């Protein structure tokens, strides 16, 4: 282990902003470690006793909080999940249809994407359900990458193709539809060895292959915007957050640097001699003597970490091209990535936010399980939870094909609505009655015509008073007997209404029982929280 140009005494007591996760494909203990990239001191390590002597495959953190990590076993269909916190002994494992060749998860840690041979799997970790399985390529998948906003997932395979899929289509509830990639690139003629994706809403895809070619793809333009050809097969790649520098590794241990800001507007095809140490256009870093398996750049683009097939890894300062740290593991470097400083690494007090369900299904299901997560912000409004319970019951009744409480209420109130419509029609008819006598003096009338008009006026007044009295009586009856429903259509209609009322009563009783169970459950949870 060597340190060059770093005064470790000045930074020994400070907390780093980011760490470096390193894993090697070895069955030996502590083959997965987390180090401080400034000093090279290990802050966390995984002994690997749960692997039972199997070689470590890939290591992937679940989400950005670093509460759990996923560890695959090399050449075995076993996947383990363990807690990072030293006091949390959580460990689960599951058996999958085959060995996992690539894995990634979203920022929340609720979704996991894994590739097994030619197929891409998507699991919901809050329930363990397998949401989708698609045949993504003609040959085995080699790499997976998820976009920064978790909206797109990209796959690369041995057939030389790169495909992009929308996450919303992979997690959709419609399991019968076929998911097709929204982007397809066939820019390589041999196997794709590495795949990296940039940050932002319009990311770019960087790939390298065994055909000596590195390609930079644009999603918005749906084309290859840069192609670099090397004199050696390319095995790994990396691009910084600002998209200004590209690093590509070869099978002989050379690392070539491409400064994108120095290229001209028409320079789309580059020729790189990675073995030439005196190359003035493309700087070559020489610190390895074996195949470069992993390359990664930190967040601010100042440090580059590289690992090779012999287990050697280096940390470089990009601006000066100086190697700050050199160390070795016991086997091939299989995982190398910069991560934020997780609170779980320090071993202090930590409250877990999420616990994955690692009973991963092997066949796609249709939402057979229900996941309820306990919120840290407790809402004490009882009416809010009553509404939530009622909405949940209505949704379950609707999905099962039964009649919901809202539909029953609508059916029960149908006679009252019908009566209200009749009354409204009568009121409109009464408003259209023409009252005579108000305009008696407008025109002279004589003889029998005048006497007849007086009689008509009296009849109209009596009719209007009678209608007003009937309307008042009807309103009074409706107010006094609002709970009573009377229908004159026959005994069958009355029986139907009584049945609906009985169903409403049963639903109200079940709702009260659920409210009582909910109250007891929250009292129990509150008591448990207070006791802790």
Swiss-Prot record:
Subcellular location: Nucleus, Nucleolus; Nucleus, Nucleoplasm
Ranges of the WD repeats in the UniProt entry: 136-175, 287-326
SUPFAM superfamilies named in the record: WD40 repeat-like
Region (Disordered): 435-464
Coiled-coil portions: 445-526
Lineage: superkingdom: Eukaryota
One Pfam entry name: WD40
Record keywords: Coiled coil, Developmental protein, Differentiation, Gonadal differentiation, Nucleus, Repeat, Ribosome biogenesis, rRNA processing, WD repeat
Single GO biological process annotation from the record: germ cell development
Main location class: nucleus
Cellular component terms (Gene Ontology): nuclear pre-replicative complex; nucleolus; rixosome complex
Ranges annotated as biased composition (Basic residues): 451-464
Role played: Component of the PELP1 complex involved in the nucleolar steps of 28S rRNA maturation and the subsequent nucleoplasmic transit of the pre-60S ribosomal subunit. Required for processing ITS2 sequences from rRNA intermediates during 26S rRNA maturation. Required in the soma to promote normal proliferation and prevent germline tumor formation.
Matches recorded under PANTHER family: WD REPEAT-CONTAINING PROTEIN 18, WD-REPEAT PROTEIN 18
Family: Belongs to the WD repeat IPI3/WDR18 family.
Oligomer and partners: Component of the PELP1 complex, composed of at least PELP1, TEX10 and WDR18. The complex interacts with pre-60S ribosome particles.
Record protein name field: Pre-rRNA-processing protein pro-1
Biological source species: Caenorhabditis briggsae
Organism ancestry: Eukaryota, Metazoa, Ecdysozoa, Nematoda, Chromadorea
Protein's gene: pro-1
């Amino acid at each position: 282990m060597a340190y060059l140009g770093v005064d470790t005494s000045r930074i020994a007591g400070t907390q780093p902003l980011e760490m470096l996760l390193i894993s090697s494909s070895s069955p030996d203990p502590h083959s997965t470690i987390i180090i401080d990239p400034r000093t090279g001191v290990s802050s966390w390590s995984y002994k690997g006793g749960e692997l039972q002597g199997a070689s470590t495959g890939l290591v992937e953190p679940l989400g950005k909080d670093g509460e759990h990590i996923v560890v695959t076993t090399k050449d075995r269909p076993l996947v383990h999940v363990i807690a990072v916190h030293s006091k949390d002994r959580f460990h689960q494992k599951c058996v999958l249809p085959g060995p996992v060749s690539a894995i990634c998860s979203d920022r929340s840690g609720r979704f996991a994407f894994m590739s097994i041979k030619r197929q891409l799997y998507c699991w919901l970790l809050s329930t363990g359900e397998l949401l989708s399985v698609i045949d993504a390529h003609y040959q085995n998948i080699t790499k997976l990458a998820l976009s920064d906003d978790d909206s797109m997932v990209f796959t690369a395979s041995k057939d030389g193709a790169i495909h992009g899929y929308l996450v919303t289509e992979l997690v959709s509830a419609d399991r019968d539809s076929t998911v097709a990639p929204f982007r397809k690139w066939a820019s390589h003629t041999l196997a794709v060895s590495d795949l990296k994706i940039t940050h932002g809403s319009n990311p770019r895809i960087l790939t390298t292959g065994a055909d000596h070619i590195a390609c930079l793809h644009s999603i918005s333009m749906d084309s290859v915007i840069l192609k670099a050809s090397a004199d050696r097969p390319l095995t790994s790649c990396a691009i910084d957050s600002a998209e200004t520098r590209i690093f590509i590794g070869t099978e002989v241990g050379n690392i070539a640097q491409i400064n994108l800001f120095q290229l001209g507007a028409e320079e789309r095809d580059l020729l790189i001699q990675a073995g030439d140490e005196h190359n003035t256009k493309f700087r070559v870093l020489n610190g390895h003597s074996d195949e470069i398996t992993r390359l990664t750049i930190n967040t601010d683009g100042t440090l580059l970490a590289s690992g090779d097939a012999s287990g050697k890894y280096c940390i470089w300062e990009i601006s000066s091209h100086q190697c700050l740290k050199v160390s070795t593991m016991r086997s091939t470097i299989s995982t190398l990535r910069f991560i934020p400083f997780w609170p779980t690494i320090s071993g202090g007090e930590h409250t877990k936010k999420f616990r994955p369900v690692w009973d991963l299904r092997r066949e796609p299901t249709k939402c057979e399980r229900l996941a309820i997560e306990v919120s840290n912000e407790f809402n004490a409004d009882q009416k809010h939870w009553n509404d939530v319970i009622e909405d949940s019951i209505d949704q379950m009744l609707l999905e099962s094909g039964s009649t919901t409480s809202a539909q029953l209420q609508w059916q029960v109130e149908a006679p009252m609505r019908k009566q209200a419509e009749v009354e409204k029609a009568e009121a409109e008819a009464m408003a259209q009655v023409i009252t005579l006598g108000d305009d008696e003096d407008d025109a002279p009338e004589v003889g029998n015509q005048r006497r007849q008009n007086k009689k008509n006026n009296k009849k109209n007044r009596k009719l209007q008073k009678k209608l007003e009295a009937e309307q008042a009586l009807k309103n009074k009856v409706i107010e006094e007997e609002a709970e009573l429903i009377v229908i004159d259509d026959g005994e069958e209609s009355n029986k139907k209404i009584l049945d609906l009322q009985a169903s409403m009563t049963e639903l109200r009783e079940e709702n009260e029982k659920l409210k009582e169970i909910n109250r007891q459950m929250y009292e129990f949870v509150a008591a448990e929280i207070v006791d802790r």
